[in-house]
């Protein structure tokens, strides 16, 4: 995924109300930007941090700038981290289509945002007449408290636990059900669960795994020009 226009640099003043942040641009202008991230963003929202913003194509949008990247140091030097949770579905779909995720390759069709169950949508659905339906749910990972070890979630997520339950139900039907955890921290070497931050999610994960839900860890390569899936990394559970 390449950013369609050059990103705009700035410094974070503060993040508030989850979806808003105040930023000072290089020319000294202060502006409010959209934050497409409902998580706690632990370690990523320190005032003064360098940030990169994208400009919306829709000129009529109330907040034309969106927060895309932040510079953070998790103990191994400064690096860029992706904070926009709208991108992971596309990033994983691109990686699957390119054959970069062997466990999910070889399907005849890839569809996104497909309705399933009673009132849900699956991020990615892989279809092939020769094998069971494969439903893929994607989660963005941007928490790191130990160098190299990324964690999910960074706050309580009842919605995330619901997704695990729904995937478990699909596995019970004989469909293939997969959770993909995508780290937008490029220095991640493995991904695990932040069970201390959301014990209920940890329990839901364990139940889903027992029912046959698979878990795949991926890590991104990030720069101001774009983001792409770089590698498969272990899921430690």
Swiss-Prot record:
Q: Which GO terms describe its molecular function?
A: DNA binding
Task: Read off the Pfam families from this record.
Answer: SfsA, SfsA_N
Coiled-coil stretches noted in the UniProt entry, renumbered to this chain: none
| Taxonomic superkingdom | Bacteria
The text of the family note is: Belongs to the SfsA family.
Q: What is this protein called?
A: Sugar fermentation stimulation protein homolog
